[in-house]
Regions:
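Structural/interface elements that position substrates and couple domains in central-metabolism enzymes
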Residues: 1-282
Length: 282
């Protein structure tokens, strides 16, 4: 996992070795000797099985994300709160709490690549994995749904200044590959918006990877929010967890807040005179 790679290597949940010879297996066991001494679970298989373990694991986690996002979309049309639903679901030991946070969809270098690879592999085998295929389709639709949330919040997008907080596909990384923020920004720009953005780590990479995006990258949260018609949280960085809403209210042009990660309680934000729109909650 990006951001926790060293920790994951030193103490993984399990070790999977795919090999065709005892020599190769023994080499891998020597590499992981310390972890094996900790009595961590180890699975030894042929190469094809090991590869499928990787794809199946990532596709399953991606499916959890797309699933909870679909439930959140339903909550937007009824008097149900996805935050409470996710918490209650996560308390079920058969489900678990991880990857049940709704938002703008998954990104990065693994989930998009592995889900698409698994779908293509299945097609080539004549055995389309329909659930994974739907997971990809749901995720592809997320930026458009998030764009509509912003549009419903402020109306006409043209000539509006919109602040994007978070560009990396997740916190604690500077990776902008397949980041949901990028497609959301593209849609906003295509509809005539002016974009100001801030990310604690990913702005340099974003400028390099997407030089065609007409974005004003700012040095901090508050400079990004100055003169804004709508503040949008896209990545749940800890830096965004303690925003000074009194200060924000004094510098924005229009007090509109779109929380695509449900970082804040709606009533709290509204108490400062902001409108609030989250994902799957009123």
């Amino acid at each position: 996992r990006e951001g926790t790679a060293v920790k994951d290597f030193l103490k993984p949940d399990r070790i999977v070795i795919g090999a065709e010879s005892e020599t190769a297996i023994n080499i891998m066991k020597r590499i992981y000797a310390v972890q094996i001494q900790l009595d961590l679970p180890m699975v030894v298989s042929n190469i094809e099985t090991a590869e499928m373990i990787k794809y199946a694991s990532n596709a399953f986690l991606a499916t959890k994300i797309s699933y909870i996002n679909e439930i959140a979309d339903m909550c937007d049309f009824c008097n149900a709160d996805i935050s409470v639903i996710s918490k209650a679901m996560g308390l079920d030991s058969r489900i678990g709490p991880k990857f049940l946070n709704p938002g703008p969809g998954y990104g990065g270098s693994c989930f998009p690549k592995d889900t698409k690879a698994l779908v293509n592999f299945g097609k080539n085998l004549g055995c389309l994995p329909m659930i994974v295929n739907s997971t990809v389709e749901v995720n592809n639709n997320r930026p458009g749904i998030m764009f509509e949330k912003i549009k419903k919040t402020i109306g006409d997008i043209e000539n509006k200044t919109i602040t994007i907080l978070g560009i990396a596909f997740k916190p604690e990384t500077d990776d902008v590959r397949e980041a949901p923020a990028v497609n959301i920004i593209r849609m906003l720009l295509d509809n005539g918006a002016k974009i100001k953005a801030y990310d604690p780590e990913a702005m340099v990479n974003a400028e390099k990877a997407y030089p065609d995006l007409s974005v004003e990258y700012c040095s901090d949260v508050y400079s990004a929010c100055e003169g804004s018609d709508c503040i949008v949280i896209v990545t749940e960085w800890k830096d965004f967890a303690g925003l000074d809403f009194l200060r924000l209210k004094s510098i924005v042009r229009n007090p509109a807040f779109v929380d695509l990660r449900n970082m804040y309680e709606p009533d709290y934000v509204k108490s400062f005179g902001f409108s609030y729109k989250g994902v799957g909650r009123k």
